[in-house]
């Protein structure tokens, strides 16, 4: 597959953009080669600047539940643009989208919009600190909550420790109040509480999507709820990825556990830049101008983004549980086919499906936390990614990302991809 134009475009981009990309994973460093530069997309397919066509399982990293260039969402955006791009003033569209989300998520009594998931999680943590009057937070190895300084933390020694920055440019003092625990390990969380003089909140992806797809266990989620209740700490579900992806009511509906706050993004913007955080009324009342905790944004509640979000959520409501059942059946079909191919070619593989999300690891053992995810064969993943890209299948360019099914996909497309997986694994086996 020729990608001459993409190579030239990438080289040109590197002259004016650091690394040639505006988000590091897009540079293909983990898998090698040149990232395709995308010209256009429709439904389940991307088309690059060389005219190559790819079946897309990245879907802009999750927002596009209905696929690229969905007509209903596009129409809503076009109508909104006619009225103006941005006002910096309240609009009824903000209220409408807030009501749509609140109606579908138990426990979300009030919500505020931001322009990204990073802003949403950053603001939710600030609010939890303001509400509780405490400084420390607990997060988990392998859970990504955006690139705000306090959350760019890696593990020290032991099960749970005060965090160390995992990026240059983040002072130690910025992360000294961030404690790190092991995912799916309640004892490590208890140790964090013991180390702290006061935990404001526990934040996690209830279905982790940034160490590969690793769901929390039911026992773990219920245990966190109990611990937070006992300690007076705010439990925050980061549903930026799993919201309106894992199920009709997100991860909290799957587990039957209601957090005190939740953060959203991706799907609620229908492809436009949107984030949100919401929760109990007494917590949200601490936000300025009602309370003293400050949060703001020039483009927060942007009317074009709100229009896309309203159209997206209303389509989800129209599809209902049947929509999520169909998407999950496609994800299961894809992963079952993948497992059969891996067995045929004697390649170790672990797979996971939750709603319209799927993940796989080239790993001999099941994965339940970040440490286990790191045992995966990343060199094999890189070869597989390259082989699939050559066959016109666009996968996330890291072993530690999640794949997404969209509503424009069907069984015949999934079966086509399974055949390509078989070919790719056979090619890898030949060396």
From Swiss-Prot:
The modification N6-(pyridoxal phosphate)lysine is found at residue 266. One of its GO terms (biological process) is protoporphyrinogen IX biosynthetic process. Keywords: Cytoplasm, Isomerase, Porphyrin biosynthesis, Pyridoxal phosphate. It is an enzyme of class 5 (isomerase). Pathway: Porphyrin-containing compound metabolism; protoporphyrin-IX biosynthesis; 5-aminolevulinate from L-glutamyl-tRNA(Glu): step 2/2. The keyword Phosphoprotein does not apply. Its EC number is 5.4.3.8. Gene3D superfamilies: Aspartate Aminotransferase, domain 1 (3.90.1150.10), Type I PLP-dependent aspartate aminotransferase-like (Major domain) (3.40.640.10). GO terms for molecular function: glutamate-1-semialdehyde 2,1-aminomutase activity; pyridoxal phosphate binding; transaminase activity. It is found in: Cytoplasm. CDD domains: OAT_like. Its cofactor is pyridoxal 5'-phosphate. GO terms for cellular component: cytoplasm. It catalyses: (S)-4-amino-5-oxopentanoate = 5-aminolevulinate. Transmembrane segments: none annotated. Homodimer. Belongs to the class-III pyridoxal-phosphate-dependent aminotransferase family. HemL subfamily. NCBIfam families: hemL, PRK00062.1. This is Glutamate-1-semialdehyde 2,1-aminomutase. The lineage of its organism: Bacteria, Pseudomonadati, Campylobacterota, Epsilonproteobacteria, Campylobacterales.
């Amino acid at each position: 597959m020729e990608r001459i134009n993409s190579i030239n475009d990438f080289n040109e981009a590197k002259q004016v953009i650091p690394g040639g990309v505006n988000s590091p994973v897009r540079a293909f460093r983990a898998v090698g080669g040149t990232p395709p530069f995308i010209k256009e997309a429709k439904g389940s397919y991307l088309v690059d600047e060389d005219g190559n066509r790819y079946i897309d399982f990245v879907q802009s990293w999750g927002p596009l539940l209905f696929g690229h260039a969905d007509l209903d969402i596009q129409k809503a955006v076009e109508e909104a643009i006619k009225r103006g791009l941005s006002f910096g003033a309240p609009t009824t569209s903000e209220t409408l989208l807030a009501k749509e989300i609140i109606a579908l998520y138990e426990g979300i009594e009030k919500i505020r919009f931001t322009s990204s998931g990073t802003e949403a999680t950053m603001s939710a943590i600030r609010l939890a600190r303001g509400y509780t009057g405490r400084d420390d937070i607990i997060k988990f190895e392998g859970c990504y909550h955006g690139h705000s300084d306090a959350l760019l933390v890696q593990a020290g020694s032991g099960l749970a420790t005060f965090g160390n920055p995992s990026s240059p440019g983040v002072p130690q003092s910025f992360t000294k109040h961030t404690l790190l625990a092991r995912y799916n390990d309640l004892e490590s969380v208890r140790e964090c509480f013991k180390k702290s003089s006061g935990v404001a909140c526990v934040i996690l992806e209830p279905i982790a999507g940034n160490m590969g797809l690793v769901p929390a266990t039911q026992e773990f989620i219920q245990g966190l709820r109990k611990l937070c209740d006992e300690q007076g700490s705010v439990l925050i579900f980061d549903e930026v990825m799993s919201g309106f992806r894992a199920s009709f009511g997100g991860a909290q509906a799957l587990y039957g556990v209601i957090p005190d706050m939740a953060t959203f993004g991706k799907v609620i913007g229908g492809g436009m830049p949107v984030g949100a955080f919401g929760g109990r009324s007494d917590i949200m009342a601490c936000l300025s101008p009602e309370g003293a905790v400050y949060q703001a944004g020039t483009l927060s509640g942007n009317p074009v983004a709100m229009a896309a979000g309203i159209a997206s959520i209303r389509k989800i409501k129209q599809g209902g549980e049947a929509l999520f059942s169909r998407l999950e059946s496609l994800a299961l079909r894809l992963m079952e086919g993948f497992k059969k191919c891996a067995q045929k070619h004697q390649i170790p593989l672990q797979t996971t499906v939750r709603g319209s999300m799927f993940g796989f690891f080239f790993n001999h053992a099941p994965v339940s936390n970040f440490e286990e995810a790191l045992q995966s064969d990343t060199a094999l993943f890189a070869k597989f990614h390259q082989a699939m890209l050559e066959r016109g299948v666009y996968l996330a360019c890291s072993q530690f990302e999640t794949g997404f099914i969209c509503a424009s996909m069907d069984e015949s497309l999934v079966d086509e991809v399974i055949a390509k997986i078989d070919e790719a694994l056979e090619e890898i086996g030949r060396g």
